[in-house]
From Swiss-Prot:
InterPro entries, per database record: AAA+_ATPase, ATP-synt_VA_C, ATP_synth_F1_bsu, ATPase_a/bsu_AS, ATPase_alpha/beta_chains, ATPase_F1/V1/A1_a/bsu_N, ATPase_F1/V1/A1_a/bsu_N_sf, ATPase_F1/V1/A1_a/bsu_nucl-bd
Name this protein carries in UniProt: ATP synthase subunit beta
GN (gene name): atpD
Keywords from the UniProt entry: ATP synthesis, ATP-binding, CF(1), Hydrogen ion transport, Ion transport, Membrane, Nucleotide-binding, Thylakoid, Translocase, Transport
Subunit architecture: F-type ATPases have 2 components, CF(1) - the catalytic core - and CF(0) - the membrane proton channel. CF(1) has five subunits: alpha(3), beta(3), gamma(1), delta(1), epsilon(1). CF(0) has four main subunits: a(1), b(1), b'(1) and c(9-12).
Described purpose of this protein according to its UniProt entry: Produces ATP from ADP in the presence of a proton gradient across the membrane. The catalytic sites are hosted primarily by the beta subunits.
SUPFAM superfamilies: C-terminal domain of alpha and beta subunits of F1 ATP synthase (SSF47917), N-terminal domain of alpha and beta subunits of F1 ATP synthase (SSF50615), P-loop containing nucleoside triphosphate hydrolases (SSF52540)
Organism listed in the record: Synechococcus sp. (strain JA-2-3B'a(2-13))
Organism lineage: Bacteria, Bacillati, Cyanobacteriota, Cyanophyceae, Synechococcales
Length: 477
């Protein structure tokens, strides 16, 4: 891990301010490099204190550079001095970052003590060389039935949570952070990219209450911040995660909520820099920007970074360039369905659309693979029969198909589960379900052993034993 140090020797001045973008002129032969951090500090004539960091994006010629602001540019005027720090934006890394909230510049924003970090690292780095990578597929248990069975996470892999607005992406991420901290004692880094300030505040307070805060570093670049901050906050969080992987040799979880906002911020910056837009108005450098971020999220021989990324799908259109570009980098895709959310089945993970590259018999084992396939086949057959049921009714089906429908409806409900982080809303205590219990539960439903239990007994329970217990209670009523 390289520790960057800034040397302030180079001073220019602002020649133009266009919203969150400035042009600055420097002495001949002393142009700052691309990605260098520039600082503007001082007091305006009206007495407003200004302290803004910029990142160089373009060299314009005539000794001028164009840079993007990481915070509000209120109060900036032409002629103000600009200092080239001589290094990219550098952020604190290591143990002192845990339990704290940072902004894109690595400054604590939780009103706590200053961070006593010994080491700092630049946010721009190359991806690890190919020889350092490890390629050993290994499943990662999350305690969430639908994910562990049908879209298992790969240790050190990348997972995408796809869904439109309000289907439960952030709640699912919060549950994963809780389960990883409680069951695996793992470290997590959370990047809040362009999401609501309220959600960031809620997440912080929930983690404090559940006692997992000391295992997480939080980095926020919210909706109200300039596009430069939202575009770079993912790299700040990734730099902190890389330190735990490379120096502390730990397995880390990196949560990004929301990767679409990273693309959106890049699109805004691209327009401000005067680049010609590409498909659907996105930046022409979309694939490169995404690749630079995603290729650094990987497993090396020292440790692993497993990444879970919420992907907002504009207008529920999976062919939009932003989600489509993200797809190419993922090992598992967890698709959240609005129709399941409308039925009240949470987590609203679509069992047929969600998939994982490690759901193979030689990686997860024959028993897991066969159970997952049988579950998907049953649900697929139920989906095919729904049109017939809608037109002719359930009575017109063959006895075999009636059985398939009954089991599919039980499976659909058993895929739901009460969450720890949603206890306040649901009133049901959260459940962590071991993979072996998940497989056993679905095998018992598929075998027909539990055909006599009411469907409602399978809704929002953990293990199959809880479903049987719930059925007894329903019967006694």
């Amino acid at each position: 891990m390289v520790t960057a140090t800034a040397t302030a020797t180079n001073v220019g001045y602002i020649t133009q301010v266009i919203g969150p973008v400035i042009d600055a002129e420097f002495p001949s032969g002393k142009l700052p490099e691309i990605y260098n951090a520039l600082k503007v500090e001082g007091t305006t004539e009206s007495g407003l204190k200004v302290n803004v960091t910029f990142e160089v994006q373009q060299l314009l010629g005539d000794n001028r550079v164009r840079a993007v602001a990481m915070s509000s540019t209120d109060g900036l005027v032409r002629g103000m001095p600009v200092v080239d720090t001589g290094a990219p934006i550098t952020v604190p890394v290591g143990q002192p970052t845990l339990g704290r909230i940072f902004n894109v510049l690595g400054e604590p924003v939780d009103q706590g003590e200053p961070v006593q970090a010994q080491e700092f690292a630049p946010i721009h780095r190359s991806a690890p060389p190919l020889v350092d990578l490890t390629i050993k597929p290994e499943p990662f248990e999350t305690g969430i039935k639908v994910i562990d069975l049908l879209a298992p996470f790969k240790k050190g892999g990348k997972v995408g949570l796809f869904g439109g607005a309000g289907v439960g992406k952030t709640v699912l991420i919060q549950e994963l952070i809780h389960n990883i901290a409680e069951e695996h004692s793992g470290l997590s880094v959370f990047a809040g990219v362009g999401e609501r300030t309220r959600e960031g505040n809620d997440l912080y307070n929930e983690m404090k209450e559940s006692g997992v805060l000391d295992k997480v570093a939080l980095v926020y670049g919210q909706m109200n911040e300039p596009p430069g901050a939202r575009m770079r906050v993912g790299l700040t969080a990734l730099t902190m995660a890389e330190y735990f992987r490379d120096v502390n040799k730990q397995d880390v979880l990196l949560f990004i909520d929301n990767i679409f906002r990273f693309v959106q911020a890049g699109s805004e910056v691209s327009a401000l820099l005067g680049r010609m837009p590409s498909a659907v108005g996105y930046q022409p450098t979309l694939a490169t920007e995404m690749g630079n971020l995603q290729e650094r999220i990987t497993s090396t021989k020292q440790g692993s970074i497993t990444s879970v990324q919420a992907v907002y799908v504009p207008a529920d259109d999976l062919t939009d360039p932003a989600p489509a570009t993200t797809f190419a980098h993922l090992d598992s895709t967890v698709v959240l369905s609005r129709s399941l959310a409308a039925k009240g089945i949470y987590p609203a993970v679509d069992p047929l659309d969600s998939s994982s590259t490690i759901l193979q018999a030689d990686i997860v084992g024959e028993e897991h693979y066969n159970t997952a396939r049988a579950v998907k086949q049953t649900l697929q057959r139920y989906k095919e029969l729904q049109d017939i049921i809608a037109i002719l009714g359930l009575d017109e089906l063959s006895e075999e198909d009636k059985l398939v429908v009954a089991r599919a409806r039980r499976i659909e409900r058993f895929l739901s589960q009460p969450f720890f982080v949603a206890e306040v809303f649901t009133g049901s205590p959260g459940k962590y379900v071991k993979l072996a219990d998940t497989i056993k539960g679905f095998q018992r439903i598929l075998s027909g052993e539990l055909d006599n239990l009411p469907e409602q007994a399978f809704y929002l329970v953990g293990t199959i034993e809880e479903a049987i217990e719930k059925a007894e209670k329903l019967k006694s009523k």
